[in-house]
């Protein structure tokens, strides 16, 4: 059935022949004046944009966030201003280490990025399906990427590189334990929790600040894959999580998550046993219980994957009044890295791409000072109005009513060794290990041994030592699974 759409060039000229190039005679060479061939091939040569350095393989969908509980005592953010208020949103889930062609069912951390189109601007909440991370200083970001990506000589993923890096950082054990557990391979994106991971802050209309962590709990139930199940799925379908999410939404089986916060006062933070801004640790729910905030569902698939998912740009600098940052060093590092990566990948005007536009405010109502740059098209480039400040016509006036409360800091600017401040690497992973059933613990041992195939004895000993310091049974179990005599491991080396 024809839709009667006639082929044109990019600039609207009719195309007379889609299949046959212009040649000098029926068997002669091409001629350069075949403008449609040149246009088509030149565009094709540039179709692929740089993939994300991490989180390259992803899936996304649009949805709606609904406030279900009053938290205005903590925040003045308009998105949370009243129970029942709804805000449009976009979510992108991803694997982390693999490239765009990687399989969805690999053992890996999963990215969990949310964009809320609030009436005060876009709010991006960028996190993972784990509440912690491998380290707590952003200077190690590039090294993590190199360690989990392809080896520069073999161009293959290297267990040795991966585990050598992880085990060189004793604080990584918490994240590694989660990754080697059943939750290391979610069945699909619909069946996993999400976390903002970092510590953020909220402040209310009185300027009172609290520290918060965000949690998103799946309403579909947690479901994970065992390695043999994952291997069978990968053999048949490398897009298993994408397919599951897309088909569920197409079938109107809309996935839902409930959002919660943990709240810590500034006084509690000052007296907290550990650094409350340390991304390698959690806040125990018994001390800081979950407070329900809202629920969101994903109910619309993108019409075009490239336009909406591949070009979606998230950055933790996209916040709204009532929500702010914290001294979390990893968050501080991401404040630069994410936006800078998007400017490289998509261009300085990526905010004009439909999925990134501040829809809750309305593009016609924004007044950015930035002008020009490649592909500036959306807002008439601010027209012929004033393009400097200060000025006499009132353009680009500040909005002082949105000033944030001050944050008291102390100490000299210095490259402090965080290990001198906190070397409590093993308490939380040990506690996590003991929360597992015996069967779950055995699977951690087996998964660890499988993933460590090809690593040196030095690296294996290092990991066994860390596990033993978290819990002696943890270390013994990993040693047994690796076929290592634990008596050969020096368990007394200080990490």
Swiss-Prot record:
Kindly state which reaction or reactions the protein catalyses: 2 H2O2 = O2 + 2 H2O
GO CC: one term? cytoplasm
| Residues at the active site | 55, 128
GO BP annotations listed? hydrogen peroxide catabolic process; response to hydrogen peroxide
**Region feature Disordered, mapped onto this chain:** 1-25
Top-rank taxon, per record: Bacteria
Cofactor(s) needed for function: heme
Annotated residues for binding of heme: 338
Subunit info here reads:
Homodimer.
Q: Which family does it belong to?
A: Belongs to the catalase family.
Ribonucleoprotein as a keyword? no
The Enzyme Commission number assigned here is 1.11.1.6
Say yes or no: keyword Metal-binding present: yes
Role according to the record: Decomposes hydrogen peroxide into water and oxygen; serves to protect cells from the toxic effects of hydrogen peroxide.
Q: Which gene encodes it?
A: katB
According to the UniProt entry, its GO molecular function terms are: catalase activity; heme binding; metal ion binding
PROSITE patterns from the UniProt entry: CATALASE_1, CATALASE_2, CATALASE_3
Q: Which UniProt keywords apply?
A: Heme, Hydrogen peroxide, Iron, Metal-binding, Oxidoreductase, Peroxidase
- Protein name as annotated: Catalase B
Q: What is the lineage of its organism?
A: Bacteria, Bacillati, Bacillota, Bacilli, Bacillales
CDD domains annotated for this entry?
catalase_clade_3 (cd08156)
């Amino acid at each position: 059935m024809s839709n009667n759409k006639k082929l044109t060039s990019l600039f609207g000229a009719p195309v007379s022949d889609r299949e046959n190039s212009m040649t000098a005679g029926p068997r002669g060479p091409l001629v350069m004046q075949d403008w449609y061939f040149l246009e088509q091939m030149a565009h094709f040569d540039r179709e692929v944009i740089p993939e994300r350095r991490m989180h390259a393989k992803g899936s996304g969908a649009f949805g709606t966030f609904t406030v279900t509980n009053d938290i205005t005592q903590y925040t003045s953010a308009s998105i949370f201003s009243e129970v029942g208020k709804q805000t449009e949103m976009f979510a992108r889930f991803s694997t982390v280490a693999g490239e765009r062609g990687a399989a969805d069912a690999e053992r890996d951390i999963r990215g969990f990025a949310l964009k809320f189109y609030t009436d005060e601007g876009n709010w991006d909440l960028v996190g993972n399906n784990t509440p912690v991370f491998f380290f707590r200083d952003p200077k190690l970001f590039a090294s993590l990427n190199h360690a989990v990506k392809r080896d520069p000589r073999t161009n293959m993923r290297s267990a040795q590189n991966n585990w050598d890096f992880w085990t060189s950082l004793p604080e990584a054990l918490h994240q590694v334990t989660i990754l080697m557990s059943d939750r290391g391979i979610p069945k699909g994106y619909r069946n996993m929790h999400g976390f903002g991971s970092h510590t953020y802050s909220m402040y209310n209309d009185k300027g009172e600040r609290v520290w918060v962590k965000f949690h998103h709990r799946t309403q579909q139930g947690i479901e994970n894959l065992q390695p043999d199940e994952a291997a069978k799925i990968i053999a048949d379908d490398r897009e298993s999580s994408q397919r599951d999410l897309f088909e569920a939404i197409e079938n109107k089986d809309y996935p839902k998550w409930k959002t919660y916060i943990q709240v810590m006062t500034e006084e509690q933070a000052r007296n907290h046993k550990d650094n409350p801004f340390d991304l390698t640790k959690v806040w125990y729910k018994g001390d800081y219980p979950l407070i329900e905030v809202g629920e969101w569902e994903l109910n619309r698939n993108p019409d075009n994957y490239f336009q909406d998912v591949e070009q979606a740009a998230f950055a933790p600098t996209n916040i709204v009044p009532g929500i702010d940052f914290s001294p979390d060093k990893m968050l501080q590092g991401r404040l630069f890295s994410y936006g800078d990566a998007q400017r490289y990948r998509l261009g300085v005007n990526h905010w004009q791409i439909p999925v990134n536009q501040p829809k809750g405010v309305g593009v016609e109502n924004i007044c950015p000072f930035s002008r020009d740059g490649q592909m500036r098209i959306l807002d008439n480039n601010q027209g012929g109005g004033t393009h400097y400040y200060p000025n006499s016509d009132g353009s680009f006036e500040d909005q002082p009513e949105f000033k944030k409360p001050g944050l008291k800091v102390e100490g000299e600017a210095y490259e402090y060794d965080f290990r001198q401040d906190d070397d409590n690497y093993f308490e939380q992973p040990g506690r996590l290990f003991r929360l597992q059933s015996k069967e779950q613990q055995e699977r951690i041992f087996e998964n660890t041994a499988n993933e460590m195939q090809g690593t040196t004895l030095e690296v294996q000993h290092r990991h066994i030592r860390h596990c033993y310091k978290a819990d002696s049974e943890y270390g013994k179990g990993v040693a047994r699974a690796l076929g290592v005599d634990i008596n050969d491991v020096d368990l007394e080396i200080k990490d």
